[in-house]
Amino acid sequence: MSDALFDLTGHTAIVTGTSRGLGQHFARALAKSGADLVLTSRCRESLLSFEEEIKSFGRRAISVELDVRDQQSIKRMVEVAEAAFSHLDILVNNAGCNVRKPAIDVTWEDWNLILDTNLRGSFFVAQAVAQHMIKRQYGRIINIGSVTSVAGYAGLGPYGASRGGIRQLTMSLA
């Protein structure tokens, strides 16, 4: 049993974007609270040492390659996760990217990369995982946002738009 304030023993959590930063912090907190983890990143090899760290907390963990911009990658991740764990209880939609530059310099490719990763990817990962949560009649989806969803910052136009979209999407799905 976990010593944490919120006991998640017996639950499985998927955290997208766990190769570094916030994703690793979220995964550590979930593991310390007793959850087993599905760690995801575009580069599975970048997760392997972190997977061992999670296992050192006495939790089960797997590392799965996931590009949230690719529907087949999402489908494969869910299949691998479901095969490894009997249920998928928690999703932390954390994967994201940013290209910080003045609006006048943002390219079509920059815009698509940011929106496809941060907004479209979050939606379709949530959709795929929610189908499994509905079968079990239990699940929690946490979408990671940003203050840029409510305040404008120079050089963060596409990023702010994507996070504003996440904010609206989250309210719509709730």
Q: What residue spans do the PLM features occupy?
A:
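Active-site helix of classical SDR
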Residues: A126, S162
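Residue(s) in the substrate-gating loop at a strand-loop-helix junction
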Residues: S146
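Active-site loop immediately N-terminal to the catalytic Tyr-X3-Lys motif
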Residues: I104, A151-G157
